[in-house]
């Protein structure tokens, strides 16, 4: 089988003056005028961008520069046609356009590579983005090479019936398939409110443009915070559509700066400073680690498409609903004007362009922070996430103004205690998000919560370099959104009947549970027993086979009926929980013998007591005892699991 001609990363860039480029105008006709939500009425000339990647910084003053980035998928067998012998073709494209081009390595298990294209251009004197983009010109050239590589080189690619999945010209049909990787926060500019923009682009270009659903077999190189935009149609029509899509993406990528003229700081320079190898590594890790279903919606069909190939819309009669999602972010009181001020604020952007409601709490004596509340009407199958985009804009406003000496920034979200449980499980624990993004993500202790916050809230604090912190915020909000809709769905679904064995089905062979003899039975009788099993089972299935097992789950309980202020059903209150976790033999040398201090860290972060069981000479297994309130015990177990996962994934 013929393989790609090269497996190396190709990086081509050079310092160039953004005002003296080899080409003076774009090749494709991309003057298009679109109205509708997500972008307003804008005329695009040249330019493109928004894939979410690394732009090479120019030596010019960063405050006057605008970075544009694209990411296009190329089948591995066609990569040689883009690179050329010894990189001659890609070098020629770079020299002709002045853009930086990076052909990513092939991720194991993928059939496609990402080709990343970036540029840095000086802004116009009034702060507007440049009218011409070298990155867009290079995108067109790379796209041409992808389409031409089959005829020029030949390759042992996929069969004709699978050709659409990889991009290129479908044999005999003349249909072209092109796929761009786009940051989730920029997808909204292509969809518009109610899908109006994407439908208008389809009609205008006579192509089929769609956001691929997550149930598709997407490449592993595409992270959870990215989507694939696929364009299908005749050759010239697809080129036309690519010009329009890339122009809208570029406008979205630079919307922050175009709305904040006169600002002295920009997140772009911090993104560039974060390192060029960070994001590709993060994509591979997050694709491998997080189950997609916990973060992503599974239906991205347009609600207005007449195309036969569009993902099927929800049938009439199903319960299609939208709910108000609410997020809260803490803002330093002296910086609140940067968000809501008439001259410097971004309220108009948030309310009119993104479509969210924004409320700011009154100052509270003794607190140097105020709460900004973001709310938006969203549906579970809506790929556009307005509340998340609004949070990212607010994060940019705050962090650009108060970076510390180490170039680290801090973002603090307020989350209701009842929702914070989704951040403590295997699939989305703060420790896993922290590990994957390179940030510190913590649930702060009760005494660290500011006075302006409710006693029923917890503070999730993200600390790290700006680009990593934004990625962590994306992953965190995706998880919270998924949990919120799950909660809403469960409220409308009748509760399933419970039994003493039901909650533990599916984990046999992985977990071993036994109630200790000192459990105090309450007046609820069998109901209390069921509650114990259910409570434990919310934690137990999160361990993978071989990662560890719970030997005993004993609870010293004092139960009483307590009034419930929400619509949830009243349940007995469990005040103390004790778990004993059997450690796999393979992780003991690293977790216990070599790194005993990790247990102290888990104890400190969770508030639970985490100790090694040493008072049983006859015991041959390695057991960790966790004791504390149910919340503390669950948090400690999640942290312990995170350490075990990281140790096993690192290998021997």
From Swiss-Prot:
Superkingdom in the source lineage: Eukaryota
Gene3D superfamilies documented for this protein: 3.30.310.210, K Homology domain, type 1
GO cellular component: nuclear dicing body; nuclear speck
Low complexity biased stretches: 292-306
Family matches, as SMART domains: KH (SM00322)
Region (Disordered) location: 1-63, 253-307
Compositional bias segments (type: Gly residues): 34-55
Reported impact of residue 233 to S: In hos5-1; increased sensitivity to salt stress
Gene inactivation effect: No visible phenotype under normal growth conditions. Mutant seedlings show increased tolerance to heat stress. Mutant seedlings show increased sensitivity to salt stress and abscisic acid (ABA). Mutant plants exhibit increased resistance to the fungal pathogen Fusarium oxysporum.
Chief location of this protein within or outside the cell: nucleus
GO biological process: heat acclimation; jasmonic acid mediated signaling pathway; mRNA processing; primary miRNA processing; regulation of defense response to fungus; regulation of gene expression; response to osmotic stress; RNA splicing
Keyword Repeat annotated: yes
CDD domains associated with the record: KH-I_PEPPER_rpt1_like (cd22459), KH-I_PEPPER_rpt2_like (cd22460), KH-I_RCF3_like_rpt5 (cd22463)
Function field: Acts as a negative regulator of osmotic stress-induced gene expression. Involved in the regulation of thermotolerance responses under heat stress. Functions as an upstream regulator of heat stress transcription factor (HSF) genes. Negatively regulates HSFA1A, HSFA1B and HSFA1D, but positively controls the expression of HSFA1E, HSFA3, HSFA9, HSFB3, and DREB2C. Forms a complex with CPL1 that modulates co-transcriptional processes such as mRNA capping and polyadenylation, and functions to repress stress-inducible gene expression. Regulates pre-mRNA processing under salt stress.
Subunit structure: Homodimer. Interacts with CPL1. Interacts with RS40 and RS41. Interacts with DRB1/HYL1 and SE. Interacts with CPL2.
Protein name as catalogued: RNA-binding KH domain-containing protein RCF3
Species for this entry: Arabidopsis thaliana (Mouse-ear cress)
């Amino acid at each position: 089988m013929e393989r790609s001609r090269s497996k190396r990363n190709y990086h081509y860039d050079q310092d160039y003056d953004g005002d003296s480029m080899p080409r003076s105008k774009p090749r494709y006709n991309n003057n298009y005028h679109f109205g509708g939500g997500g972008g307003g009425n804008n005329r695009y000339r040249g330019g493109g961008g928004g894939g979410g990647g690394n732009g090479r910084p120019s030596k010019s003053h960063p405050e006057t520069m605008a970075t544009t980035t694209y990411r296009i998928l190329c089948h591995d067998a066609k990569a040689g046609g883009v690179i050329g012998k010894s990189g001659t073709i890609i070098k020629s494209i770079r020299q002709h356009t002045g853009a930086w081009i990076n052909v990513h390595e092939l991720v194991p298990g993928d059939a496609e590579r990402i080709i990343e294209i970036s540029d840095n251009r000086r802004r116009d004197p009034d702060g507007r983005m440049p009218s011409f983009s070298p990155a867009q010109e290079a995108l067109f050239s790379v796209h041409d090479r992808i389409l031409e590589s089959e005829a020029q080189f030949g390759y042992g690619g996929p069969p004709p019936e699978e050709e659409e999945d990889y991009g290129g010209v479908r044999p005999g049909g003349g249909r072209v398939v092109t796929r761009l990787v786009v940051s989730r926060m920029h997808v909204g500019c292509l969809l518009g409110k109610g899908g109006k923009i994407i439908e208008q682009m389809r009609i205008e270009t006579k192509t089929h443009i769609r956001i691929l659903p997550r149930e598709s077999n997407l490449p592993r190189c595409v992270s959870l915070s990215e989507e694939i935009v696929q364009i299908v149609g005749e050759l010239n029509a697809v080129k036309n559509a690519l010009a329009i899509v890339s122009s809208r993406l570029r406008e979205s990528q630079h919307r922050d700066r175009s709305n904040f003229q006169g600002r002295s700081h920009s997140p772009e320079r911090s993104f560039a400073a974060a390192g060029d190898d960070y994001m590709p590594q993060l994509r591979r890790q997050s694709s491998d680690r997080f189950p997609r279903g916990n973060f992503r919606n599974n239906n991205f069909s347009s609600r207005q498409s007449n195309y036969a190939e569009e993902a099927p819309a929800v049938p009439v009669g199903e319960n299609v609903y939208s709910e108000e999602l609410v997020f809260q972010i803490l803002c330093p009181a002296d910086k609140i004007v940067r968000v809501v001020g008439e001259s410097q604020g971004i309220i108009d952007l948030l309310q009119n362009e993104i479509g969210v409601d924004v409320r700011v709490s009154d100052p509270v004596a003794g607190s140097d922070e105020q709460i900004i509340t973001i709310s938006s009407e969203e549906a579970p199958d809506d790929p556009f996430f307005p509340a998340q985009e609004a949070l990212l804009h607010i994060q940019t406003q705050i962090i650009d103004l108060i970076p510390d000496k180490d170039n680290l920034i801090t973002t603090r979200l307020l989350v209701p205690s009842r929702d914070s449980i989704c951040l403590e499980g295997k699939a989305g624990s703060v420790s896993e998000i922290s590990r994957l993004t390179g940030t510190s993500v913590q649930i702060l202790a009760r005494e660290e919560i500011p006075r302006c916050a409710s006693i029923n809230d917890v503070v999730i604090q993200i600390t790290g370099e700006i680009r990593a912190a934004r990625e962590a915020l994306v992953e965190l909000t995706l998880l919270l959104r998924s949990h919120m809709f799950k909660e809403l769905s469960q409220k409308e679904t009748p509760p399933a009947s419970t039994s003493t064995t039901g909650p533990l089905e599916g984990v046999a062979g992985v977990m071993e549970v036994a109630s200790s003899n000192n459990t105090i039975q309450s007046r609820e009788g069998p109901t209390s027993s069921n509650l114990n099993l259910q409570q434990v089972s919310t934690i137990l299935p999160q361990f993978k086979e071989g990662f560890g097992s719970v030997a005993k789950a004993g609870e010293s309980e004092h139960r009483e009926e307590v009034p419930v202020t929400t619509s949830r059903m009243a349940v007995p209150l469990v005040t103390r929980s004790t778990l004993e976790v059997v450690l796999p033999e393979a992780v003991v040398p690293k977790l216990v013998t070599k790194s005993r201090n990790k247990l102290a860290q888990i104890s400190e972060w969770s508030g639970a007591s985490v100790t090694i069981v040493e008072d049983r000479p006859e015991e041959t297994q390695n057991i960790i005892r966790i004791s504390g309130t149910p919340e503390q015990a669950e948090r400690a177990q999640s942290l312990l699991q995170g350490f075990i996962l990281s140790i096993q994934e690192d290998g021997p």
